[in-house]
Design a protein with these regions (language model features):
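N-terminal cap/lid segment of alpha/beta-hydrolase-fold proteins
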Residues: 1-57, 105, 284-288
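Mobile cap/lid helix-loop segments that gate and shape the active-site cleft of serine hydrolases
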Residues: 25-34, 169-218
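Short beta-strand element of the alpha/beta-hydrolase
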Residues: 59-67
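Catalytic nucleophile-loop/oxyanion-hole region of alpha/beta-hydrolase
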Residues: 73-83, 94-130, 283-286
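Primarily recognizes the serine-hydrolase "nucleophile elbow" in alpha/beta-hydrolase
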Residues: 114-178, 210
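Short beta-strand/loop motif that positions the catalytic acidic residue
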Residues: 222, 228-230, 234
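C-terminal catalytic histidine-bearing segment of alpha/beta-hydrolase fold enzymes
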Residues: 229, 243-304
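Conserved alpha/beta-hydrolase "acid-adjacent" motif
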Residues: 235-244
Length: 304
């Protein structure tokens, strides 16, 4: 089942009945694009949630945020494959195909929070008592944003699963692409033609946003418990992101479980399917262990 978040478009004042409207447009007017790898980009009016319900639900649901550097969403390896795995275990899934920020930094989180509102509204109907969030790479940043920047109990996830997540926007930790796609390209902030006062004002805002969207800064005792996975040899998103999030959770007395594998790189997704005929799956040696530990963790928190 696919639910459009903004059936009248993002320029409308109101969106889905269960949502709080688009509030803001990302300015994208061109057509949405997709490719054979399952990537989808230029999402605007078509922002949506794909709902997957198992034959027999165990009471859990996960709102999934695929990765893609805030430029596209990897809807196959970090979306549909997740839904297949989860529903086979009785867990309902909502894959969010959120609008691209294009420098409108609030937009992805607005869409995820509206997805939570929709799912909470229909939870009893679907037999759901616990709704968490899961994210990969930049989608991990979005999932961590949902976990730390929620606005009420409806939008607060009951738990988080973060897979090779971006956590900090510190230039030392994160690639320029993800940061620029979320906050806007450097020239938007560093235009030397601006008057001095305007330039200084923009620089202050930029550094404020870097701090705000470095999500470890918002972790406290009310942050949802988390399951975190990363690989030591990840060159795109260094493992320090996960360590930073985990450490702040522990310092705040929040339950957390972290697994760091020595090899696997970045973007290995939730299934080995994508690797068939396309090179070596560097995470193949650890997939079974990863799936077993995640399944056990989800089962344990369901019983709490």
């Amino acid at each position: 089942m696919t639910v459009l978040l903004y059936p009248e478009g993002q320029e409308a004042e109101n969106g889905l009945q269960e949502a709080l409207g688009p509030k803001l447009s990302n300015g994208i007017t061109g057509p949405e694009w997709s490719d054979e790898t399952g990537r989808i980009g230029s999402i605007s009016d078509s922002a949506r949630v794909d709902i997957y319900l198992p034959k027999k639900c165990n009471g859990q649901m996960i709102v999934v945020c695929p990765g893609g550097g805030y430029r596209y969403v990897s809807a196959l390896k970090e979306g549909l494959h997740v839904a297949d795995w989860m529903t086979a275990r009785g867990i309902a899934v909502a894959v969010v195909k959120h609008r691209m920020p294009e420098g409108h930094w609030e937009i992805p989180l607005i869409d995820v929070q509206n997805a939570f509102r929709y799912c909470r509204t229909h939870a009893a109907e679907w037999g759901i008592s616990q709704i968490g969030v899961m994210g990969f790479s930049a989608g991990g940043h979005l999932a961590a944003s949902a976990s730390t920047l929620y606005v009420d109990e409806i939008t607060r996830p009951d738990f988080s699963v973060l897979i090779y997540p971006v956590v900090s926007l510190n230039r030392k930790f994160v690639g320029q692409g993800t940061r620029n796609n979320l906050l806007g390209k450097d020239e938007m902030w560093d235009d030397k033609e601006m008057k001095v006062a305007e330039f200084e004002e923009k620089q202050m805002l930029y550094h404020k946003l870097l701090t705000h969207y470095s999500l470890q800064n918002h972790i406290n005792e009310k942050t949802p418990q988390a399951f975190i996975v990363h690989c030591s040899d990840d060159k795109q998103v260094p493992v320090e992101h996960s360590i930073l999030y985990y450490t702040r959770l522990i310092d705040s007395n929040v339950d957390a479980e972290m697994h760091i594998y020595p090899k696997g790189g970045h973007g290995w997704g939730f299934s080995s399917e994508k690797w068939k005929g396309k090179g070596k799956d560097k995470f193949a040696y650890a997939r079974a262990d990863f799936e077993e530990t995640l399944e056990r963790w989800l089962e344990n928190i369901r019983k709490m």
